[in-house]
Amino acid sequence: MTARTTKVLHLQLLPLLSGVQRVTLNEISALYTDYTLVCSKKGPLTKALLEYDVDCHCIPELTREITVKNDFKALFKLYKFIKKEKFDIVHTHSSKTGILGRVAAKLARVGKVIHTVHGFSFPAASSKKSYYLYFFMEWIAKFFTDKLIVLNVDDEYIAINKLKFKRDKVFLIPNGVDTDKFSPLENKIYSSTLNLVMVGRLSKQKDPETLLLAVDKLLNENVNVKLTLVGDGELKEQLESRFKRQDGRIIFHGWSDNIVNILKVNDLFILPSLWEGMPLAILEALSCGLPCIVTNIPGNNSLIEDGYNGCLFEIRDCQLLSQKIMSYVGKPELIAQQSANARSFILKNYGLFKRNNKVRQLYDN
């Protein structure tokens, strides 16, 4: 049997096409033909996978919230499905879904169980109770994991030194980007308006409220900026009702399948997340030549060097964020220089081909 016939199950929570799901899509399209996806319901991801003849199976009991009844139902359904299909590899994503998937896979005696950490959630927990709950869940999941993929050195440290994973089970494989597809706009001309963009779920983790407060403050001071938010999420409706302006300076675009063209026509990319693994959205923005203003957290700060290809600010600090944005207003030469640096940085370090080869080796070895 060749590696191409290996049966691989990818487990995701949401069928979106945001960063985590696009990482999965990139892996599936480049590696094996015999793939199956399990997620909570049908959506953009399952639609995109039709092109690759990938079977998609939905388990509606998979939810982000911890609910004992639903979680046990989801675990049982996962176990039955994995046992029936006899997968060689189960590759999980997301925190709680990843834990349920790993437990189900080991109970079904799957030979290789892999989990990708897209940012540990417990370091950013809002209370001690939440911290210890999420920490304990990740610690338990360790015993059901054969190989752990981390995207940055901070999560590698947490896995080995806090969760006590064995060193030979942890693999640092950063995300990668298709640099041919995500390329800068040729002969870009900067207007007097500073065009800002955020791509990501409008959710608690991404903290879009901090960005909206910062931009709203600048607009109230008559600073010539415009913000486009690309993405959906549980906070979209309430944020839109609070911050949408009649002058069109704050746009809630919703999700788009045309991220690359949206990035190209903007000037700066902003991501105010509370925690991350290694955001594909930042890699794609840098590859398109956008300097990035992002929070100083693991995953983000390994990609952005202050003053070189963007700048950093502390989480939930809308005042500092507004100052960082102001530092680019009326400075097209600064943006152009950091744009060139951003593109060069990606070309040297974060090609998609290199990343997929490392994942392939992990599957095969």
Question: Which residues fall in each region the model found?
Answer:
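N-terminal strand-loop element at the rim of the active site
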Residues: H10-N70, L172, G233-L235
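Short His-centered aromatic/hydrophobic patch
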Residues: T92-G98, V117
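Aromatic "clamp/platform" in nucleotide-sugar-dependent glycosyltransferases that forms part
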Residues: W255, L274
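Short hydrophobic beta-strand element within catalytic cores of glycosyltransferases
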Residues: V38, P291-V294, I304
